[in-house]
Amino acid sequence: MARGRGRHERRGEMPLPSEDEGTMLCIVQRVVGAGFLEVLCTDGEVYMARIPGKMRRRVWMREGDVVLFLPWGTADKKGEVVYRYLRDEVRKLIDMNLLPEELVEEVAGAE
């Protein structure tokens, strides 16, 4: 039987937002339920994000988490969560100027 990854093992490389792939950074504003989140993205828009099944079972998401989001490209402002960043990864994103610190503080202050 295969063993799962331990809690402290490396998760691999941290994915970055890419204009070619269409991904962007977002912050979870509200957990709607049934595998959906309301996220505020760096472009200032609020989207409805779906958590894929493989993530839903393994990764818990809560308000204030920073996620990598892939919009579906339709007019109804929906998309899919690709990755959830850990606290140290969020600090790296802020240091690389990919994520405005004001956006993180704004959502954290609203809780």
Curated annotation (Swiss-Prot):
Extent of the signal sequence: none
Keywords: Initiation factor, Protein biosynthesis
Pfam families from the UniProt entry: eIF-1a (PF01176)
Keyword Protein biosynthesis in record: yes
SUPFAM superfamilies according to UniProt: Nucleic acid-binding proteins
Domain S1-like, chain residue ranges per copy: 12-86
PROSITE patterns reported in the protein's UniProt record: IF1A (PS01262), S1_IF1_TYPE (PS50832)
InterPro entries per UniProt: NA-bd_OB-fold, RNA-binding_domain_S1_IF1, TIF_eIF-1A, TIF_eIF-1A_CS
UniProt keyword Protein biosynthesis present: yes
GO molecular function, one term: RNA binding
Sequence similarity: Belongs to the eIF-1A family.
Free-text function comment from the UniProt entry: Seems to be required for maximal rate of protein biosynthesis. Enhances ribosome dissociation into subunits and stabilizes the binding of the initiator Met-tRNA(I) to 40 S ribosomal subunits.
Name under which the protein is recorded: Translation initiation factor 1A
Native organism taxonomy: Archaea, Thermoproteota, Thermoprotei, Desulfurococcales, Desulfurococcaceae
